[in-house]
Regions:
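A surface/extracellular/periplasmic glyco- and lipid-processing/surface-interacting theme
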Residues: 1-151
């Protein structure tokens, strides 16, 4: 989308915390940068409990994206896998959150087949209009919804 203000009626959400495995090295933190209308990503915490900026390997700059999706999915063990790996069900439908323009939108998602695009819809059934630019998708097991916190 190119228009500003499309989602002004939705609640503000400047900070997003996704604490995988109960806070630690794998925690994802997104802070809304009003100046650039983007989200700065950090990963994990330092010894003083401050988020560690997640730097792009090539540019060495902190990762920033225009849209963040939290997609809740069903997680299950892969049968007979000797390493105990997990499967995340990405085909089908579910719920999630979209963070865009400093706002948060409760969404539903639908993906008809493995080679199809995942579609995201607001509570009225309208397709989400994402900002031009990067989209970061955080796939979160639906049993861990309480570990996704925003304000």
């Amino acid at each position: 989308k190119d228009e500003v203000g499309v989602y002004d009626s939705y609640p503000n959400a400047n900070d997003l915390f996704i604490d995988f495995w109960f806070k630690g090295d794998y925690s994802a933190i997104f802070k809304y940068d009003t100046e650039n209308n983007s989200y700065l990503r950090s990963m994990g915490y330092d010894e003083n409990d401050n988020p560690i900026p997640h730097a792009d390997q090539d540019t060495k700059e902190q990762i920033n994206v225009k849209n963040v999706i939290v997609q809740y999915v069903t997680e299950s063990p892969i049968p007979n896998d000797p390493k105990g790996r997990l499967d995340y069900e990405l085909v089908g439908s579910g719920t999630g959150l979209v963070f865009i323009d400093g706002k948060v939108i409760d969404v539903t998602w639908n993906k008809e087949a493995r080679d199809e695009r995942t579609m995201f819809y607001d509570s009225d059934g309208a397709e989400i209009q994402f900002n031009r630019g990067q989209i970061w998708v955080s796939v979160v097991p639906d049993r861990n919804i309480e570990q996704v916190v925003y304000n």
